[in-house]
Amino acid sequence: MAEVRPAADDFESLEPSIKNIVEQDSLKWIFVGGKGGVGKTTCSCSIAVQLALTRRSVLIISTDPAHNISDAFDQKFSKVPTLVKGFQNLYAMEIDPNLGFSNLPEDYFEGPDMMSMGKAMISELLGAFPGIDEAMSFAEVMRLVNSMDFSTVIFDTAPTGHTLRLLSFPSVIEKSLGKILSLKNSISPFISQFGSLLGMQDLNADQMTSKLEETLPVIKQVSAQFKNPDHTTFVCVCIAEFLSLYETERLIQELTKSEIDTHNIIVNQLVFPSKREECNLCEARYRIQHKYLDQIQDLYEDFHVTRLPLLTHEVRGVDKILNFSSNLVTPYKP
């Protein structure tokens, strides 16, 4: 077999690891995303594990409808933060990103039947703003997560299109709720009259919008943090193939447009041919990947590019994730 140049010889300009993320204590929000099938969940869980070694408390949230973090950790998670087995400071939860405002729990609207009616009316009102229904569900999750005071929160996101929508939620909510709350004084007399007709003397706009008013400051804070590189960063995960590289470039352009920091790329599932064994398929695969690694080097010379190997086994369970995650901070050598 012809000798080939190791991929690890590339990318000398910046540390080829996520040490910069681990060592940046100010980071509050870390998003991990990319094209489907590139190993985002394994990378998300590995980042979470590495951060748990140095942070006070870490939460990983799956916003992917497939909810693969349960499979990765080999432990069932729900919409409530649950301690990951084997850790004292790492929690995981799974949320359904497709739930809308109407799916929020009843205790979101504290009070008697009047508030249930308020929920229905506000739901109809919010329906006039495209994207706000789904965004409000995300807003409630962010409000709860914010109140739990985790040191760092990692989002294991769905494929690229949904991820970009997720990141736009704070600005969607800020604009839409601002408009709704600005109308409150105008519609308040009509709501009071409507309540009187139904024999509900206490029904008023203040009660109906109280939760929205609680949510808006949190969302403004989160929106500001998302655009602050001291608090938020995005880790792009890809494989060394044309479609994945194309999707990564599109993602980075959108993140830049949205003013969201990104300076880490993880290239997953790389083949490192053995000099001891003949493997024509491995060498052919390596040469294809190396072509795209060269392109990544040219395109993203100001990024930390971490290379992860294609393994012969699944990365499932805490022990295997811990072992695999070491490649994120210590560059892999075949």
Curated annotation (Swiss-Prot):
One of its GO terms (biological process) is tail-anchored membrane protein insertion into ER membrane. One of its GO terms (cellular component) is GET complex. Its EC number is 3.6.-.-. Keywords: ATP-binding, Cytoplasm, Endoplasmic reticulum, Hydrolase, Metal-binding, Nucleotide-binding, Transport, Zinc. It is an enzyme of class 3 (hydrolase). ATP binds at residues 35-42, 241, 268. One of its GO terms (molecular function) is ATP binding. It is found in: Cytoplasm; Endoplasmic reticulum. Gene3D superfamilies: P-loop containing nucleotide triphosphate hydrolases. Its main location: cytoplasm. Zn(2+) binds at residues 279, 282. The active site is at 64. InterPro entries: Anion-transp_ATPase-like_dom, ATPase_ArsA/GET3, ATPase_ArsA/GET3_euk, P-loop_NTPase. Belongs to the arsA ATPase family. HAMAP family: Asna1_Get3. Homodimer. ATPase required for the post-translational delivery of tail-anchored (TA) proteins to the endoplasmic reticulum. Recognizes and selectively binds the transmembrane domain of TA proteins in the cytosol. This complex then targets to the endoplasmic reticulum by membrane-bound receptors, where the tail-anchored protein is released for insertion. This process is regulated by ATP binding and hydrolysis. ATP binding drives the homodimer towards the closed dimer state, facilitating recognition of newly synthesized TA membrane proteins. ATP hydrolysis is required for insertion. This is ATPase ASNA1 homolog. The lineage of its organism: Eukaryota, Metazoa, Cnidaria, Anthozoa, Hexacorallia.
